[in-house]
Every structure is written in C-alpha cells, then in structure tokens.
Amino acid sequence: MELVTADGEKLHEILQDTYPIWGEGLTEDAYAKWYRAQRDTTWGRTRLSRHALVEGGRVLASAKRYDLQAWTEGRRIAVAGIGAVFTPPALRGRGHAHVLVDALVADAARRGCEQALLFSEIGATYYEQLGFRAVPTSEQTIEVLPGRGGAPAVLIRSGDTRDLDGIAELSARARVGASFALDRSADFLAFVLARRRLLAGLGPMGLRSVEFFVTEEANQPVAFVIVTRGPRGNVLEDFGDRDPSGARVGAMLQVLAARTPAEGPLVVRGRVPRAFHPPQWRVVKETPAAEIMMLRPCVDHAALTPAPEAVVYPSLDVF
C-alpha cells in the first residue's frame, strides 16, 4: 500500500464514488466542477489536495488534505486538515481508512505540522480509535431582535474581494486570546467564501444563496457578516466587528431582517463564541455542533487540549 496524490483517473473515480454521499444536491458533473473550482483558487492551488491509499493501482481509501495555519496559546502552528475520508463500500471493514489517516498524519509530521484536524459527521468514537480527541464546540440559534423606531441606523454594502484584507485583520483581532483559531489570510477567506458561492451557483436555482455584507469607515471594513440560506436553514457563516460588543454585526443583521418583514424575526444559527453577544440578538438555544471538531498530535510532544469555550472557529471554515 502507498499514499499518493489523487489526480487524473484516480481523482475522477474518487469524485464518482463520493458523489452519492457529499453531492449536496448538485448534479454529478457540477459536483466535480465544484471541487476543481476550489482547487483553482489561489489558496486551493497550493493548499487543497486529494490523496488516496492505493495497492496495485486500486484505490482503497481517499481523503482531502487542507494545509492550514492556526494559533493556539499564542503560538502559530502548521495544521493538516483531513476531510472527506472515504472507503469504497466493497472494501470497508478492512482498516483501509485507518491506514490512510495514519499515513496522512505521518506525512504531515514530516512536513512540520503539529496537529491534524478533522470534523466528524459520524460521532467521535471511530476517530478516537485513530488517536483523535474531540474538542466540544457548540452552535447557537439566534433570533435577531427588531430595531427600535424604524430601520436600523447602519449603512451596509455588498462585500467583495477588496474587503478581504480588512476582514483578515478583523479575524486576527477576533482570535486574540483564543485557545484555538485558524490563521485566516485574505487568500484563505477568498477560498472558503468561493466554496460557498460555488455550491450555490452550481446547484439548482433558488436552492441556496450567499449574502456577504460589510459596514465601512474611511473606506475600510469595520464589520461584516456572511449568511447562507438553503437546506440547512439560515446559517451565520462568519462575522466580525471592530467593536468588541458586536453592535455593528447586530445592526447589520437587523438590516437584513428588515428587508423581509413579512417573514417575521430573522433566525440564524452558527458557531458563535459565547463572549460575542450583540445587544440586537437573543440566543434561543445552544446545542453541540453537528460536526465534531477533533485534533490529533502529529508528533509525540504536541498533545493539545484547547479550552472549548475559547475556540474561535466560524461555520464558514468547517470542512
């Protein structure tokens, strides 16, 4: 068995096999275009790849690899993100996925990575057997309160590429004091935003939408929100505010709610740090996040147990 980068026919085979699980309502052709378009972004060309465990030319298991940077306890570390771990049905139960993950972690260690990170949709037990440890994170359901005395007094505009450097700065402010947070460059932000926009654009008309808005002062973004609407409901994918109270973010959501008053209060859900609580919203409930965040050290001395309440990881970055 050997670990190889999946391209050409192997990549085509993997995309065909994984489509029934992760097709997201796309056609099979659109699903393949979605992955390839992510790879074609500036960040994706060098930091997103697909890998396969092969024997005799046969794909035994496959996974995506994301080359990430993160901050933990004031240190910047390299992190190997692992996603879409898949074994063809006829080959399951033989330990191929275990061997693949071990090989990816060993390769990450050789490349200087300190941690491997994944998000499990199948519970924690399986990946705990592979040496991962769950980091409990939560998702909040939030009701946006109506503005008082008419329309909210904040001006917003659609966000675009020119805003990403400023948003990267807002993200850097948000991670101060975090027990674990990604280092989010402008190129990385362009990648994760493109991933959502491509999914909406390649899917059936009207199934999904992506809303990206900023508030600016002196031609610089001082707050932003990214909201998606679709089969998973209204998701507050990402947000940031130069004001620690989050009042601008709250006011921006009030503006979005005011566009459709007949629909009633705007309700969104997302991974929101408990310390971030704008006065314009009310937390309806808090539940464990559906995708379980899990870490595994790539080297023996690098065990990491970040305080869950201090993890900063927006929904937009989950893979």
Predicted segment positions?
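Amide-forming acyltransferase catalytic core, primarily the GNAT-like/NAT-type
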Residues: 133-238
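Core nucleotidyl-transferase/polymerase catalytic module
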Residues: 45-46, 60, 66, 83, ...
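Active-site/acyl-donor-binding loops of N-acyltransferases
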Residues: 125, 131-150, 226-319
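Mobile, glycine- and charge-enriched loop segments
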Residues: 72, 77-91
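Conserved GNAT acetyl-CoA-binding A-motif
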Residues: 106-120, 261-272
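Conserved acetyl-CoA-binding loop-helix of GNAT-fold acetyltransferases
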Residues: 84-87, 93-106, 245-259
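Conserved beta-strand in the GNAT
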Residues: 50-52, 58-68, 81, 86, ...
